[in-house]
């Protein structure tokens, strides 16, 4: 079983990764999701995957999601939340699909924690 932290879950690569995970529940478990501000898409992903944590780096979007969502997934916000997803103990692999510089710092943090990077 691969335990994955998915950074950039609402983008094209992230959405495809979610589809693959849903099609292979005995092989892939998404433990953490992270996105910028697509709170409605992230909420759908949370409901489908039931990760341990989910992050929106846009704090306003995170506040909107927190008001609506009352499940077990912990909702985090901002860069601190993104770093938590990148270094999450429950994941052995970080799939870094964030665009540009925004993904560099969390990816480096994941490497420093010994995570596999995809």
Regions found by a protein language model. Name each.
Residues 49-51, 90-91, 115-116:
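Glycine-enriched alpha-helix->loop->beta-strand junction motifs that scaffold or abut catalytic
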Residues 1-54:
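N-terminal Rossmann-like dinucleotide-binding module
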Residues 108-118:
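Beta-strand-loop-alpha-helix segment that lines the small-molecule cofactor/substrate pocket
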Residues 29-32, 55, 94-96, 118:
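Short catalytic-loop micro-motif centered on adjacent basic/acidic residues
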Residues 77-109:
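Beta-loop-alpha module in the N-terminal Rossmann-like domain of NAD(P)-dependent dehydrogenases
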Residues 12-16, 102-105, 116:
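Gly/Ser/Thr-rich beta-alpha loop segments that engage phosphate groups in nucleotides
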């Amino acid at each position: 079983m691969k335990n994955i932290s998915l950074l950039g879950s609402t983008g094209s690569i992230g959405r495809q990764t979610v589809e693959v995970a849903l099609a292979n529940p005995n092989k892939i478990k998404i433990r953490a999701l992270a996105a910028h501000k697509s709170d409605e898409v992230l909420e759908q992903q949370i409901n489908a995957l039931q990760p341990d944590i989910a992050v929106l780096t846009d704090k306003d979007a995170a506040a909107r999601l927190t008001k609506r969502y009352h499940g077990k997934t912990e909702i985090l916000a901002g860069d601190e939340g993104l770093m938590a997803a990148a270094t999450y103990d429950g994941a052995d692999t970080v799939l870094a699909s964030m665009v540009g510089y925004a993904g560099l710092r969390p990816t480096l943090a994941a490497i420093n924690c010994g995570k596999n990077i995809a």
